[in-house]
Structure formats: structure tokens, C-alpha cells
Amino acid sequence: MNIIPCSIKTLKGLYDISGVEVGQHFYWQIGGFQIHAQVLITSWVVITILLGSVIIAVRNPQTIPTDGQNFFEYVLEFIRDLSKTQIGEEYGPWVPFIGTMFLFIFVSNWSGALLPWKIIQLPHGELAAPTNDINTTVALALLTSAAYFYAGLSKKGLSYFEKYIKPTPILLPINILEDFTKPLSLSFRLFGNILADELVVVVLVSLVPLVVPIPVMFLGLFTSGIQALIFATLAAAYIGESMEGHH
């Protein structure tokens, strides 16, 4: 007779132990505006890591690169090749944008698994990777949308909008809808993957010994890197598409 109440108590106990909080946020009031503090704090940490790493690695460049300098030169070459492949010969001005997107998302994703965010206690919610928040991923997707609109308009002028009625005006609604679905797919793909990965690891750590979730954490690091690469590749592809005018 007491099986159901005991089961409910057991499940409630496991939920309390897990400490998974979804939708809990900590806000700052600045100048009458409500600011999402969790995202700002973790984003500042990620930006500091990126800037600090670059400064340390290249503050004294050598003719024969050191390990740190060699690593960053390899990363730059990788981003340059990615941009050239997706955008074409006019890729040069877009390397900083694609590189910034890739590195910020990559370090943000990895920070969710490697940095002990829970050490910092907040009145509400808890810190996590910046890309674990839909606000961040939507902002990145909107920046990408603005970038490919700018790329198309700067090269073609107002004739850029002719693409909406090609190859036939009947496709006008579909072509317009496509520009709305691009940022949606970019933002929700990144947000969903990172959130799911962190929740799985947190739940496993709370329910089983520490050794068991380690393979899942390594898998999460791999998929996090892949998500950063996918986002940067799609951003570059959209920019290249807007400049070339093909689908």
C-alpha cells in the first residue's frame, strides 16, 4: 500500500540531489533595464580566456614559432581555409567574423564541461556555458543574419532582393520564409545540443559514481566542438550564398 508514496519520495529525493535548475535566472537592474546576469558573467569569463590566451601566445612572436604561437597560427589557418571554402575568393574580410564566432562558441561549449561554474553561488539559478542560454544563441544567430544581409547588399546593392523572386515569383513567400528559418535553426540547434549535453552529465553525476559519466563528458566535449564547427560553417556558407546569389 505504501509503494507509491515511497516511490514518489524516492524520485523527489533524486531530483533534489541532482540540483538541475532549468529556467532559473539571476538578473541585474541597470539603468531601469533588467539584465540577464548569468549570461554576462559567463560570457565575460569566456572572452577573458580567449583574450588572455591570445596575448600570452603572441606577445613575443618568434621567427620559429613557439608551441603557443604555432597553435594559434594553426587555428587561424584552419579558420581561413574554412572561410575560403564556404565564401570563395572574397573571404578575406570575413575571416575575423567567422573566427570570432567559432572561437567564442567553441570555448563557451567547452567551458560548460571543464569549468567549475557551481563554485560561484548565485541568489537564483546557477552559472553554465553561455551557449546553454537561448539568449546567447539567438544573439549569435541574429548577428549571422545581419552579416549575410550586409554581405549581399554591399556587393549587389538593392538588386540583392531580386533573389526572392528567382527562379520564379511564385517562390517569393518560401524565399522570405527561408531567411527567417536560418537564424531559428542556428540558434535552437546550438542551444538544444549544449543544454541537453549538460543536463545529461549533471543527472548522471548525481545518480551514479563519478567514473561512469566520464565517457559521456568526453563525448560532450567532442559534440561541443562539432557544434561550433557547424555554426561557423553555416555562417560562412550563408555569407557566401548571399554574395553569389545561388541556393
UniProtKB/Swiss-Prot annotation:
Signal peptide: none
Protein's organism: Oryza sativa subsp. indica (Rice)
Any one GO cellular component localisation term in the record: plasma membrane
Quaternary assembly: F-type ATPases have 2 components, CF(1) - the catalytic core - and CF(0) - the membrane proton channel. CF(1) has five subunits: alpha(3), beta(3), gamma(1), delta(1), epsilon(1). CF(0) has four main subunits: a, b, b' and c.
Topology class, membrane: Multi-pass membrane protein
One GO MF term attached to the UniProt entry: proton-transporting ATP synthase activity, rotational mechanism
NCBIfam families recorded: ATP_synt_6_or_A (TIGR01131)
Family: Belongs to the ATPase A chain family.
Protein name: ATP synthase subunit a, chloroplastic
Listed InterPro entries: ATP_syn_F0_a_bact/chloroplast, ATP_synth_F0_asu, ATP_synth_F0_asu_AS, F0_ATP_A_sf
Ranges in a coiled coil: none
SUPFAM superfamilies given in the database record: F1F0 ATP synthase subunit A (SSF81336)
Keyword terms, alphabetized: ATP synthesis, CF(0), Chloroplast, Hydrogen ion transport, Ion transport, Membrane, Plastid, Thylakoid, Transmembrane, Transmembrane helix, Transport
Main function: Key component of the proton channel; it plays a direct role in the translocation of protons across the membrane.
Name of one Pfam family that matches: ATP-synt_A
Subcellular location: Plastid, Chloroplast thylakoid membrane
Domain of life: Eukaryota
CDD domains: ATP-synt_Fo_a_6
Transmembrane segments: 38-58, 95-115, 134-154, 199-219, 220-240
